[in-house]
Every structure is written in structure tokens, then in C-alpha cells.
From Swiss-Prot:
Its main location: membrane. Gene3D superfamilies: Multidrug efflux transporter AcrB pore domain, Multidrug efflux transporter AcrB pore domain like, Multidrug efflux transporter AcrB TolC docking domain, DN and DC subdomains, Multidrug efflux transporter AcrB transmembrane domain. It comes from Pseudomonas putida (Arthrobacter siderocapsulatus). This is Multidrug/solvent efflux pump membrane transporter MepB. One of its GO terms (molecular function) is xenobiotic transmembrane transporter activity. It holds the Pfam family ACR_tran.
Amino acid sequence: MSKFFIDRPIFAWVIALVIMLVGALSILKLPINQYPSIAPPAIAIAVTYPGASAQTVQDTVVQVIEQQLNGIDNLRYVSSESNSDGSMTITATFEQGTNPDTAQVQVQNKLNLATPLLPQEVQQQGIRVTKAVKNFLLVIGLVSEDGSMTKDDLANYIVSNMQDPISRTAGVGDFQVFGAQYAMRIWLDPAKLNKFQLTPVDVKTAVAAQNVQVSSGQLGGLPALPGTQLNATIIGKTRLQTAEQFESILLKVNKDGSQVRLGDVAQVGLGGENYAVSAQFNGKPASGLAVKLATGANALDTAKALRETIKGLEPFFPPGVKAVFPYDTTPVVTESISGVIHTLIEAVVLVFLVMYLFLQNFRATIITTMTVPVVLLGTFGILAAAGFSINTLTMFAMVLAIGLLVDDAIVVVENVERVMSEEGLPPKEATKRSMEQIQGALVGIALVLSAVLLPMAFFGGSTGVIYRQFSITIVSAMGLSVLVALIFTPALCATMLKPLKKGEHHTAKGGFFGWFNRNFDRSVNGYERSVGAILRNKVPFLLAYALIVVGMIWLFARIPTAFLPEEDQGVLFAQVQTPAGSSAERTQVVVDQMREYLLKDEADTVSSVFTVNGFNFAGRGQSSGMAFIMLKPWDERSKENSVFALAQRAQQHFFTFRDAMVFAFAPPAVLELGNATGFDVFLQDRGGVGHEKLMEARNQFLAKAAQSKILSAVRPNGLNDEPQYQLTIDDERASALGVTIADINNTLSIALGASYVNDFIDRGRVKKVYIQGEPSARMSPEDLQKWYVRNGAGEMVPFSSFAKGEWTYGSPKLSRYNGVEAMEILGAPAPGYSTGEAMAEVERIAGELPSGIGFSWTGMSYEEKLSGSQMPALFALSVLFVFLCLAALYESWSIPIAVVLVVPLGIIGALIATSLRGLSNDVYFLVGLLTTIGLAAKNAILIVEFAKELHEQGRSLYDAAIEACRMRLRPIIMTSLAFILGVVPLTIASGAGAGSQHAIGTGVIGGMISATVLAIFWVPLFFVAVSSLFGSKEPEKDVTPENPRYEAGQ
């Protein structure tokens, strides 16, 4: 094949150009993400039950739906949370690889079975089923710069004018408004109702009857009488539109003809649908809408589309209102991708310099360098065909591939120059002769390296997604590299290399290259003597190898484990929790203190603070608060102002708050897998011990966790039990008084809850009508005495006649996990510890809890647990595949052993480098480790294959090994140094994505240094020892050519 293209160099150029063109076009179409879709697909069900407690929502809604969800294909786990404001969310998480559209259809079908069993009030509110991830993509805020609009005005504007276009934007999965639109609020006065012998039920019935839209038909509609000349639509009664119209609703006509209207017993006006949440941006009145990404959607494309949507809406904003993005996860995507691209360019430059240093021929260096853009651009084309994206994982793989892909070109160019020098052939003929010698070896080495990485492509789960990105990218680059080395590089050699006279290649050079060559040759001579000494004294070095293996095993056990390294995402969360039962006003005081500290004391780091009162990730309620903190760009912050340093300083300050618990935490590396770094676990009531016992177990767990030196910031992702007023109805007494239970329940729901009646029209938009008691009539238990129910005789009976109450405790938020009541706990490893060690400590503490209490990992912790169980199998498969490929390559079961034995020599260096830098054994480390294994095997192949052929030609094992080492030292050092320097930019990276770059670069550099330095001494030992052990015959007479050369070009 190579001969064909050597004779037709333009044909080779055309193929190379086509490959680059296809790759360039693919880059324009490839989506850009920080990570691929690592998180498993999730479907969320959202429901609201106005006026219901968390327990009521759980008993009447959550469990009904959960029981119907059983039997859905590929369902991994189901979690739910019920809140005291009547809201509820059930999240069904599926196995990685499940089609989210299919999952949503299956969930919807199961939900249809449950809907008729739900309370009527829930069905009236509607049930939302969305494809969504757990975290927010970004928050869009509206802030009143001049204070002319209140938070309620802004929230109404968002819901009325922005919510719909935002929800229609491609890629938006779900959203949450921090506030509510206007509703027609009817505030009942119980004294006036009693005065007119009316009840809340009467008012609701009258409003429902008189605020209606009637379809009145037509005059002259078909079929019509002959001769009909008129056709007109009849406009009947329509929905009310103003507070004045509602005040005129007729409630009662007295015997004397006087009328009682709604305005006589209630205050009517526009107000919020609910008042649970309020927001501020840098202390100014604001409202916001948090957007969640749809499963499988592109983050950058979605964020760009949302910004364009907002830009189109801005001309219609009220005066003094400005749109802001107080929380945005996409800048880190562009910054991290940009950083890796710079790393890629730096790697190419460093590899070029190393090649030029060793080849000492500018034309030869240019030839090898020209293969880089061809292979890299071609790889992008393969990524597009495979449905991948441009992300940090594929870009890291590109960086790792640079050192591999130039290696094939180096082998071709070096061998062509050797043939020209030894045989005096012109470039074209020398290239043909050279390619005949090395074609098989090029393919063989590519197969071995692919064997190391291909098993990664077949693993499942979120970890499997990460492995596949690396595996497919590197293997594709290597495949293209071999193709280019067989087609394009020979054509370049035949046309670009200058002819060499016989022996000219080895003539001494002057200047720097002469100095370098002389010193390198002296090193080669010393190396040759050292190898001879090792082969003459095998036992001490075999024992040293055994010690290296033991050290490798010890380091593996010692290095802490993790899933992914932490990253500075440029955003920080702060969560506020005031004592149970605290008012919103009390919580706002703490929120203000927190914001003041961040904007003043951390002004060099913090760009903006968006605070929310009434909501946090732990739950909703007046005792909850949240801050979304945007940091300044990475290039404006030093290491002392990283997100982790800020979180630590902020947490120390927040510990001084006496009236609240405030936690500052950074988001995880993969935002799709949760909202916080560290671990995520559910304590479960598997024994049915009840809420109180589960709460006791939770508190016991938190107490023990606080004493552990391994754990930090351990907190419940829920709310503490708070005071609740248990109202008991005496059914017998009520019956004796002639009061029905239905009237009692309806009166309570309307007066103390917020009862939805129907809808009205406000400025062309349909909004809701709510009836509720005025605030002064529902502030304390004594206010219940103000409310009356009419009995069968028409008499007004006070609640005090048949109801009594007592104070108790209950949870404002209830969680369930896989069908049982549960409590979520979040936390992080203490400084100096990894998430793997923290998870082991959590399991130890959970094992000491009372019987009936179990635990389950979720989110990123679930994925980390899964990845840890996969690592040994992946490692073993990779080594096995290498062995099998080598056995096929050499037609021998013994020779591959000499190559495989080099694996620990690379691993030990990766472990030492990772340990010295304080990094963890995570997914990136494992990818780097497997790459190191492949490269270490490649270096061993260069020596073993050459030694094997020399031995078959009649050399002794000893002489064959030494000669192979001497001849292959220079290319081994050159390719290894090129690879190491190509990865150096990863290890010294800073800014966005630096954690991942350090994790993968450190292990690879350490592994390659040890694999190169140690392998060149131990590989000949392995070759001789294994060959002797398996009975390789020594020649009868040693043949020592004067100028031994490796005719295979290896």
C-alpha cells in the first residue's frame, strides 16, 4: 500500500487534505460541553397541593404515584421530597444510556394510572412531567435598579412575560421561579362573615358561580330557517377582570331586599399567588427564574439561546428594570475548553522541539510535525460520526494522543534516513525499502496500544461515559496515525528528504548538536555497560523488581480514592438555615449579614450575590435561605481567591452567626450529578421504625460525624422538625351540633390555607383566584375561635364548640428514597482526605446506627461507588488484552510476558507522582495509568522485538539484549521525552479545569518517567530471564556482525 502512494504523492496529499477538510467541517458542527452527558437520565414529576402539609402531600400524593412507578424499564432509583408549602417533586433516575424520551413516556403512562387517585385540588393545579437534571444551569434575574418595582412586581413580570418564551427555548428541561405571579386574592374577615351569617364555603361557592365564562352560542346559527338574514355570536357572561368586579359579587339577599356583596366581608385585590419566596440581587429588590437543563441538551447552546431570548425581551422591560445572570455554569465550560486548546498547542510546540533535538534534521522534523494536524483534524471527524462532543475529556485525550501519533511518523522518517545512510539509496527507493521493513511493526504497536484502551469503551454507567470519551478518541487518533504513517508520511519522505551518501548520516556534527550527540553517545556506552552488569547479576535486580511490585501494591492501597477531582467552577453556594419555626423576617436578617460579608469583605473575589429567602437545596420554608455567589473571572483571581479558599474563609465567618447555620460550598465537578461537592447519602427507614426514630438516627449520625476527623461540613439536606399545631375535631360533638365534617374541612382549608377557586383575566393573561382568611385572623391558635360553620338549622357554630388543638412537632420537608422514608445527608472530606475515605467513614458510622436504619448512596457518590468496583476489572482486562495481542504479534506465549512485566515499572511512577502531589486515585488517574501502561509496553516492544530477531539470527540472548538496548535507546528516549513534555502543560495548568488537568497529567508524567528510566534496564533482563525460563535455545556459535543493524527498522 505504501509503495502505491510513494509513486503517487499527490494522491497522498489529496487524502490528507480530505481528512483535514472533513475534520475542520466537523469542528464547526460539533457541540461544545464541559463534559458529555455523564449524569444518568432523570424524569421529574412536580405537583402542588395548596394548603397541605408535608405529611399530607406524602401520604396522599407521593406514595400514590410511587406505587405506580414500579416496573418501568431501566429504573435505577426513585427519590421524592414533600414540602410544607404543598409542593412535591418525584425524581425517577434511570440507567445510563436509557433514552430520556422513552423514559418520559413510560413515566407519563404510569402517572396516568395514578392521576384519578389523587386529590381533586392536585388535579386542578396540574401535574408537570419534565426531563431535567438535578442542578441549575443558570439563573436569570430581574432587578429594579431604581427601586420602583417590588419583588412581587418583578416576579409577576417574569411569570407573565418571560416564563413562556424561556420555557420554549431549546434545551430547557425545567425551571423554578423565585416568586409568583399575581393572583386575585380575597382576604376574608371572619367577624363580618359571622355578622352576615355567611361562611367561607358560601363565599367560595358564590365566586365560583359568578366568575365564569359562558359559551352562549349564536343567533342564526346552522341549521337555520329559510330566509335567515342574520348570523351573530352571542357574548354571554365572561370572567371577571378587576378587583372592583369581584367586590360586586353577590353573596346574599336578605328578606328585606338588602344585599351582601363580597366587598362587604372581604378585602379584594391583586397579590402574589404565594409569598413563600423573595429575592434580592446585591441587596436590591429582585426576582429570578432558575433554569434546569433538559437531559442530553447542550449547555452552551442552551445558555446562548437563553441570552438571545432575554436580549429580545429587554426592549419591553419596565423602566428601571435590568436583566442579570447572577448564577451561570457555562463560563467554566468555555474557559476550560479554551485552556485545554492552549495546552494542546503548547504540547505540539514542545513535541516539535524534542523531535528536532533528536532528529537534527529540519525537513525530517517538519515531516513528522505535518502529521499532527492531519490526525487531530481527522479525529474530530470520527468524533462527529460517533456522536461525541468537543469537551474536556476528548481534548485531554487529544493532548495524550500527540505523543503517540508523532511516534509512528518518527519511526518512518528515522528508518528511511537509516536506509539511505546504510545503503546509499535515493529518498524514493529508500522509502520503499524502509516501508517494506516496518509496515507490520507499525500496525502491531497500534494494536497493542489499542488493546490497552479499548476495554474502557465497554464499561457502563457514568464512569463508562468518561472512559469511552478517552478510549474512542485516543484509539481513533492512533488508527489515523498508522494510516497517515502508511500513506502520507512515506510520500513526504520520498519527496522532501534530501539524499544522503552512504554513511553520511553518522558523520559527526558540530555546534550544539555535536555536543549533544557526543554526550548522548557517552551515555549510551555507560548504559550498555550497566545493562551488561544487570544481565550478569540477575538475582539482585529481580528481587528489586519484586520490591517495586510490593511498593506498587502498598501505594495503591495508600492513595485515597475519589470519583473526579474538584474544580473551581467560578460559582459558590451558601445555604442558610435558621432555627425551626423562624419567621421569614428573622431569616432575612441572616441573609443580609451573609450578603454584606461577601460583597464587602470578599470584594476582590466576589462579583455578585443573588439571595433567596424561603428556599434552599434542603427545602422550602420561612427558615430557609440561599445565596448564589458569582466569582470574578479566573484571570482576575489568585490561588488565594479560588472558590475553595473563599468557601473556607466564608465558612469560618459564618460559624460566628449565632442565630443560624450557614454553609458555604462549591458545586461538584460534574454539575449534572448534584449541587455540592463531597458525598451524598440517604439514611432509610427500612425497618418501618417511624419518623421519630429516623430523626433520632439522623441526629446520632450527625453527632458521630461531627467527632470524626475525616469528615467536615456534614449537614442534613432537609429541615428540622418544627412546631406544628395539631387540630382535633370532635366528630360526635360536631354531629350533635348539626355541623357536617365536610363543611368543617372546607372552612379550614379556605380560611387558614389558600383555596384555589378558578381563574380570571388580568391584562390578557389567565391568572388564578384564591380565597383565604386575612392575616389577623390566622396568626395564633386563638384565632380559630373567630371562625364559624353554619349548621343544618342555619345557626353559626364557632370552631371552639367542636375543635381543640395542641402543639406538637413535625417536619416541614419529608423525603423518600426507593419507596421508603429517608433523610438525605451531605458532607465533604476534611482537608487532606479524599471522598473515598469520607465515604468509608460514612459507612462505618451508618453501620453503628440502630437496627431498621439503612443507607443508600445517591448522585455522585453512587457513581463513585460504581466506578471503584469497576477499576480492578478494567485494569485486568487491559493487561489481558495486551498480553493476547502480543502473543498474536510474536506467535509466542512466552515473549509477551517480558513485555507485560514492564507494567508495574510505569505504575509505580504514576503512584509516586500522584501521592507526592496529594492527588487521588480517581477516574482521570486511571485513564492516565492505562495510557502509561500502553506506552511502557510500546517501549518494551521496541527492545524485545529487536532482541528476538537478533537472537533468531544467531546472537546469544545476552548479546541480543544488549545490542537491542543500544540500538533502540535513542528512539525510546526521543518518543518518551516528546510524550512527557507534551503532557507537561497539563500538570502546570491553572484556572478553569485545572483540577482535571493536574489529575491526568501528574500520573502520566510520573508513570512515563519511571517506565522509561526503569524499563530500559529491566526489559532486557525480562527478555533474557523469560527466554531462558521457557527454554530458548542458544546458538551453537555466536555471530557478532561488525556493525549490527536492526533491519526491521524497529
